[in-house]
Structure formats: structure tokens, C-alpha cells
A protein has these predicted regions:
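Sequence-level detector for tyrosine residue identity
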Residues: 38, 45, 53, 67, ...
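Surface-exposed beta-strand edges and flanking loops
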Residues: 8, 54-56, 68-71, 79-85, ...
Length: 243
């Protein structure tokens, strides 16, 4: 199983003003984390890939499909994206404001992973589906400084683990649901022909108080899945026998 690894570089200087934690080596002040991020999906552990996968409840019509670009709509159970071998600590303020509109598929930056894909109801009936992002494995509490930004169409939500000191959500974020679940949303009444556009962004927040030397050498695994629900037909009303 491939995992995200957190390492330290003593030869690069963090130049952004809002990174305030530094490590002094000689006359150089440095604070940098390097990350090898991975996401697993679809029963297969893929090294150096970020993947989204699709599930259906048993014995249902497969109405929901996922694809990377509108020019290549093919039914798939999973999508794979490129990742970066190294990812330095970042800040939410550094991220481009147009991440959810700039490109389809992989469009990573120097210090974040970004992947855009589409979910469409392409078949013949209105459905409900669930979207989840789940933490598979954590070593050295790397999730304490993790940020996951989810764009669904034009709606943006930033997810983070609650503060370990106050138990409250970090500023400007929505708290993870629990230790394993970053987010879980149920999309209802998803009509035939309707499309949801997702952009997922993953980075390590350098301004988080938990972003310390203790994370160095840690690992994390995260995956996302979409699950189409079985459609339950309403029962026909029965005439009551009054005799």
C-alpha cells in the first residue's frame, strides 16, 4: 500500500509571508514539509495516483457515471490522476481562486494536488447518490494539518480536523465528521442529464498549529467514492377490506 509521506528539506526556504514556523540551520531559516500524496480507489492500490471510484448498490440500474472530461464520456468505475512526488507545506490563501474552473483532470500546483472530474446521471431515472472522502490510514498524526477542499459545482467547502486544543473547527473550515470520515454528502433528486462537477484539492496547511516537526516521517492514505443508491419504488396503495 502506498502512503503519503511527510519529510523535511533543509535546503529550501519557505518564502510565503504567512508561514511563521521556521527551522534554523546555520544562518538559514527553513521550515518545509515534503509530501508524497496518494489516494486509493476501486479495490486496487495504485502508487503515485489519485483516484476516484464509483459504486452501485446491488441489483440497480447503473444511472450514475463518472468521467474526467466532457469530450471523453465513457463508463468507468474509477478515475486516476497524477500526483506530485514532493509537496511543500502551503496555505489556503496561496491557492488560486479559479481552481474549480481552470482545467479538467489533473492540474496540480507546486504545493497542492488538484483534480477535477464529473458525475452525471446518464440513464433513465432520477436517483440519489452519496459522496464520501475517507481516511484509510494515518501515521504520526499527519491528518492534524491536512486540508481537503471540495468544490461541487460552484460551492466550496474546506475540511479539516478539529483543533486538538479546543475541539472546535479550524478557522474557515468544516470539521471532519469523525476520525476516519472527512466528508459525507447525500445528493438527492439527481435528475436524468444532470451533471455535478467536482474539484478535489489536498494540501498540508503550514499555518495550522499542528504543522510541527512531529509530522515529519508520517504517512496518510485518503480515498473518495461515489455510491449510487438503489431506487425504492413507492408501494401501490391497497384497498382496505372493511368487511
Amino acid at each position: 500500500m502506498s502512503k503519503t509521506k511527510i519529510n523535511k528539506s533543509a535546503k529550501e526556504t519557505v518564502k510565503k509571508k504567512n508561514i511563521k514556523r521556521f527551522l534554523k540551520i546555520g544562518s538559514i531559516v527553513v521550515f518545509l514539509f515534503l509530501v508524497n500524496l496518494y489516494v486509493i480507489l476501486s479495490f486496487v492500490y495504485q502508487e503515485k495516483s489519485f483516484t476516484v471510484y464509483l459504486e452501485h448498490e446491488d441489483r440497480i440500474e447503473k444511472n450514475l457515471m463518472i468521467y474526467e472530461t466532457k469530450d471523453d464520456k465513457r463508463y468507468r468505475y474509477h478515475l486516476k490522476a497524477d500526483i506530485l512526488d514532493e509537496l511543500s507545506a502551503a496555505s489556503l490563501a496561496w491557492l488560486p481562486e479559479n481552481l474549480h474552473t481552470e482545467a479538467d483532470g489533473s492540474h496540480n500546483g507546486n504545493n497542492y494536488i488538484a483534480y477535477t472530474f464529473y458525475a452525471e446521471n446518464w440513464w433513465k431515472e432520477t436517483i440519489n447518490y452519496n459522496a464520501q472522502i475517507i481516511i484509510d490510514d494515518v501515521i504520526r498524526n499527519v491528518d492534524e494539518a491536512l486540508r481537503v477542499v471540495v468544490y461541487r459545482n460552484d460551492e466550496k467547502v474546506v475540511y479539516a480536523k478539529p483543533s486538538s486544543t479546543t475541539g472546535e473547527p479550524e478557522e474557515g473550515t468544516k470539521a471532519f465528521i469523525d476520525e476516519k470520515t472527512i466528508m459525507a454528502e447525500r445528493i438527492e433528486n439527481f435528475e436524468v442529464g444532470q451533471v455535478d462537477k467536482y474539484t478535489i484539492v489536498i494540501f498540508i496547511e503550514g499555518d495550522d498549529a499542528e504543522c510541527t516537526d512531529a509530522l515529519i516521517g508520517g504517512e496518510i492514505g485518503v480515498y473518495m467514492k461515489l455510491t449510487e443508491e438503489k431506487t425504492v419504488e413507492p408501494e401501490e396503495p391497497q384497498d382496505e377490506d372493511i368487511n
